[in-house]
Regions:
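Short, surface-exposed "cap/lid" segments of acyl-processing enzymes
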Residues: 89-98, 102-150
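Accessory cap/linker subdomain of secreted extracellular hydrolases
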Residues: 47-50, 69, 235-334
Length: 406
């Protein structure tokens, strides 16, 4: 769930999709400039209070984003930063979520612009970790640029609690992020002209989980939209083994970096969870540092992780461990059968989301009867090739059948 590698991987989208998608929407192959993920400076202020309408997807506020992102503006796209209404996956209360939408230059295809909602990887759990607060979208400008140049209205949601929507971020709670993805599509299609109802959910790591959840929720929550498919790259489908690894002292180094986020997120789902009940002396002393955005003070974080004991995040009692497992167990995917095609790719050498965890999720989805295309990549870690995924995406937008690998 490392957000730093995500934008690099996303940059490859255009090269693969260009040939198959241009026939669909009319576009030219995008260039491939070098990648930078250095966050631009930003300032944050208290989130404004919004008057909710009771209609998820309603745009509550919007502003021009083109003058903030010169690289995206150079593509000719029209850019908006907006806040839209969504729904908490924890208590079903209305929430406000911020995002960016990019509308391609030129004439929309027959039937209107199709939409890609792109779920970003882990950026943190604090409000100022929202990509749309930064001109370069914390590096995700390249994914937005690629999909937009291919003829898709592209929407990048921050997720609840990140950016300027307000509230807290229930990190890796999939119903919330799934709702946020669906309502991002709904907001774009209700507020922008010349829109099709057809859309796809695409994401990597945390965003891969969000895309999977959006697929499962589409039938009951996504009324009025036509989800053609979802793409999940390195998605965390079951986090209970992560809790067990913490108990056993078997966490990998990058997993240790994520545990403070996970504990914070679990506390947003169950306020009786105290992250300090799962934190050793080093984690407790460095808690504020470890909860900063994923690109912040990397040297300090590395030193803290290096000093951690193997069982740094073991629960202080069997009762505490079970309490956390009860919450994290609710995150496990799949949860329901879906009839919408889904692509899942994961690396056999992934040391963050271990490959067996994803393989088990795929096996369960197959048992439910999901139309799933899964690909384990033997030489890849958390960064996986997206070539087959993008071919899948072009096919489902073209209305072609995609054989399941189950």
């Amino acid at each position: 769930m490392n957000a730093i590698s995500g934008p690099n991987r996303a940059r490859r989208v255009g090269a693969v999709l260009a040939a198959s998608t241009c026939a669909l929407v009319g576009c030219s192959s995008p260039p491939a400039p070098s990648v930078t993920v250095t966050p631009a400076e930003t300032t944050t202020a208290p989130a404004p209070q919004y008057d909710f309408t009771g209609v998820p997807g309603t745009v509550l506020d919007s502003e021009d984003f083109g003058d903030r992102s010169t690289e995206l503006s150079a593509t000719g796209a029209t850019l908006y930063r907006f806040v839209y209404e969504s729904t908490s996956g924890v208590d079903n209360s209305p929430t406000a979520v911020s995002g960016v939408a990019a509308v391609p230059a030129g004439t929309p295809p027959a039937g209107g612009w199709p939409t890609v909602v792109y779920g970003h990887g882990t950026t943190g759990i604090q409000a100022d970790c929202g990509p749309t607060l930064y001109p370069d979208l914390l590096g995700y400008q390249f994914a937005v640029q690629d999909f937009t140049e291919l003829g898709y209205v592209t929407v990048l949601p921050d997720y609840q609690g990140l950016g300027t929507g307000g509230g807290t971020h229930p990190y890796l709670e999939p119903r919330t992020s799934g709702h946020n993805m669906i309502d991002a599509a709904r907001a774009a299609q209700s507020a922008l002209p010349d829109m099709s109802t057809r859309w796809a959910a695409v994401g990597l790591s945390q965003g891969g989980q969000a895309a999977w959840a959006a697929n499962e929720l589409a039938a009951t929550y996504g009324q009025g939209l036509d989800l053609v498919g979802s793409v999940s790259l390195s998605p965390p489908t079951d986090l209970t083994p992560l809790v067990q690894a913490a108990t056993d002292g078997n966490l990998t180094r990058p997993q240790k970096e994520l545990l403070p986020y996970l504990l914070y997120g679990a506390q947003q789902v169950d306020p009786t969870i105290d992250p300090m009940d799962y934190s050793g002396t080093v984690a407790e002393a460095n808690n504020e540092l470890l909860l900063t955005c994923s690109g912040g003070d990397t040297d300090g974080k590395e030193r803290a992780v290096e000093a951690m004991a193997p069982d740094e995040f073991a629960a202080d009692s069997a009762q505490s461990e079970q309490q956390l497992l009860d919450v994290i167990g609710r995150y496990t995917l799949p949860q329901v059968r879906t009839e919408v095609p889904m692509f899942v790719a994961y690396g056999a050498k992934d040391d963050i989301v271990l490959p067996q965890w994803t393989a088990d999720g795929v096996e369960k989805a197959c048992a439910l009867g999901d139309p799933i295309v899964a690909q384990e990549q033997p030489e890849q870690g958390h960064d996986v090739s997206d070539e087959a995924a993008m071919q899948f995406l072009a096919a489902v937008f073209a209305g072609q059948s995609v054989p399941s690998t189950c």
